[in-house]
Swiss-Prot record:
InterPro entries: Invertase/methylesterase_inhib, Pectinesterase_inhib_dom, PME_Inhibitor. Keywords: Signal. PANTHER family: PECTINESTERASE INHIBITOR 7, PECTINESTERASE INHIBITOR-LIKE. This is 21 kDa protein. Residues 1-22 form the signal peptide. Gene3D superfamilies: Invertase/pectin methylesterase inhibitor family protein. Pfam families: PMEI. NCBIfam families: PME_inhib (TIGR01614). Disulfide bonds: none annotated. CDD domains: PMEI-like_3. The keyword Translocase does not apply. Coiled coil: none annotated. It comes from the Eukaryota.
Amino acid sequence: MKLSKSTLVFSALLVILAAASAAPANQFIKTSCTLTTYPAVCEQSLSAYAKTIQNNPQELASTALQVSLTRTQQAQTFMKRLNKFKGLKARQYAAIHDCLEEVEDSLDRVSRSCDEMKNLSHAKGNDFTFRMSNVETWVSAALTDETTCMDGFAGKGMDGKIKESVRAQVVAVARVTSNALALVNNFAAKHKH
């Protein structure tokens, strides 16, 4: 099948235009991510959504929360599988069970935050402030839940592959949640009276 020159030129123009429109959005994400604790993680986790985010701070914060939600769901799935693992020591089982509860609490808080962010488009004045305060509080509490998860794994008796696997999951979730909190706080600060 032979493509005409005009088809090739048109296709090339579409690719160039798509790249050009994504460039400002990617720059917006990169600049915004400098405000976070983990800028490289922030940029990497959000750049795929540049087309959706554009230069919209609310969309950026909402998308960061969605990334946190997805990552928390993945950690929950991992913890549930690990919780069913045969051959765990009683202390490992208890730590995994407690950690799973913390991850589930975190998941609930981030999910509620995502829902609240969706309702912001209609909120004004005190209603906006109240809703943003909810989001900030819930995301902060979710981050606390995530970091508390590792408490049960303290001590040398808990060292090993189980602890390291859980730690890797928790660190990944905590980083995207921390970044989401920073972006939410930045968005809220720009809209305070």
